[in-house]
Amino acid sequence: MARAIQFTKMHGTGNDYIYVNTLRFPIARPEKAAIEWSAYHTGIGSDGLVLIGHSDKADFSMRIFNADGSEAMMCGNASRCIGKYLYEYGLTSKNVITLDTLSGIKILELHLEGRTVETVTVDMGVPLETDTIDFDGEFPFLSTQVSMGNPHLVTFVDDIRIVNLSEMGPKLEKHPLFPDRTNVEFAQITGENTIRMRVWERGSGITQACGTGACATAVAAHLTGRTGRTVNVVMDGGTLTIEWDEATGHISMTGPAVKVFDGTIELRE
């Protein structure tokens, strides 16, 4: 049986997802839909699928499925886009929205130009754990492990241009030290409180940007004495401003949310 599903493709600093309002269009097998629809040659093309739904604990809920069908705990770029979607499609008139995710309740603050959401600030909460990883000499670098509700491994290098991310990303993502796999970031300090970062996302591979990865990189940079608490993280798809509040310990992330197009696709269940 096939049904027509309305979707919106959006991106946050180039991290592109397919968004579906499951209050209108429920999807029974989102893992399958994510794999089929994310394919660039035979589907819509994206880094994954984001489902907007009901929550008893917040204004709305968010579920994220990577391009390989695995479910993600959290995505900062997707949460910003959801804020834009909810406001501009009339699901809410609030400019502060609570969002129920697998890594907890997130608070979105919308920054408007008239009736258009230009940027969104997300309270990403407190980094859950940090650790230094030396790989027992297997690799010629030290890395910092940071959890932002999902796992990240941040490595600082002198020149990010020489990093073969296609080779190192999957090696580190699937390293035995990380049985649940990890997201992988390589970063370079390029100026006072400015970081250049590239990312290999767990379940998606190389992407243009990663919001939680930018947050994890900012945390790692400050913990290792490289930057202050407010930084700009420059990624292939754009720049995010990350602030780590000293009083509360919370990380906030501010950046753009962009609608690409609306469409309808057939769902076979």
From Swiss-Prot:
Q: Which residues form the active site?
A: 75 (proton donor), 210 (proton acceptor)
Q: Record's superkingdom?
A: Bacteria
Q: Which reaction does it catalyse?
A: (2S,6S)-2,6-diaminopimelate = meso-2,6-diaminopimelate
Pathway, per UniProt?
Amino-acid biosynthesis; L-lysine biosynthesis via DAP pathway; DL-2,6-diaminopimelate from LL-2,6-diaminopimelate: step 1/1
Read off the InterPro entries from this record.
Answer: DAP_epimerase_AS, DAP_epimerase_DapF
Q: Name one GO molecular function term.
A: diaminopimelate epimerase activity
Q: Which GO terms describe its biological process?
A: lysine biosynthetic process via diaminopimelate
For binding substrate, which residues are annotated in this chain's numbering?
Answer: 15, 66, 76-77, 150, 183, 201-202, 211-212
* The UniProt record lists the keyword Amino-acid biosynthesis: yes
Q: Does the keyword Amino-acid biosynthesis apply?
A: yes
Supply the Gene3D superfamilies for this chain. Diaminopimelate Epimerase, Chain A, domain 1
Which key words are in the record? Amino-acid biosynthesis, Cytoplasm, Isomerase, Lysine biosynthesis
Q: Where in the cell is it found?
A: Cytoplasm
An example GO CC term for this entry is: cytosol
| Site feature location: Could be important to modulate the pK values of the two catalytic cysteine residues | 152, 201
**Which Pfam families does the record associate with it?**
DAP_epimerase
Which PROSITE patterns does the record cross-reference, listed alphabetically?
A: DAP_EPIMERASE
**SUPFAM superfamilies recorded for this chain?**
Diaminopimelate epimerase-like
The record's EC number reads 5.1.1.7
Query: What is the recorded function of this protein according to its Swiss-Prot or TrEMBL entry?
Result: Catalyzes the stereoinversion of LL-2,6-diaminopimelate (L,L-DAP) to meso-diaminopimelate (meso-DAP), a precursor of L-lysine and an essential component of the bacterial peptidoglycan.
Similarity field:
Belongs to the diaminopimelate epimerase family.
| Self-association state and partner proteins as the record states | Homodimer.
Name the chain's protein.
Diaminopimelate epimerase
The beginning of the lineage is:
Bacteria, Pseudomonadati, Bacteroidota, Bacteroidia, Bacteroidales
